Amino acid sequence: MFTLKIFVYTTVIFFVSLFFFGFLSNDPSRNPNRKDLE
């Protein structure tokens, strides 16, 4: 149960940080030339 909780927290933090930094560095509205992530 403890391992599952650690896995869930790690996954959530990973995706949140990935989305957060991705949104800051590659904002579609500020960088219309970037078509890597729609």
Curated annotation (Swiss-Prot):
Keywords in alphabetical order: Chloroplast, Membrane, Photosynthesis, Photosystem II, Plastid, Reaction center, Thylakoid, Transmembrane, Transmembrane helix
Entries under Pfam families matching the protein: PsbI
GO cellular component, one term: photosystem II reaction center
Family, similarity comment: Belongs to the PsbI family.
Superkingdom per UniProt: Eukaryota
SUPFAM superfamilies per record: Photosystem II reaction center protein I, PsbI
Protein's membrane topology: Single-pass membrane protein
Species assigned in the record: Gracilaria tenuistipitata var. liui (Red alga)
Signal peptide: none
GO biological process, one term: photosynthesis
InterPro entries named among the record's database cross-references: PSII_PsbI (IPR003686), PSII_PsbI_sf (IPR037271)
Protein name: Photosystem II reaction center protein I
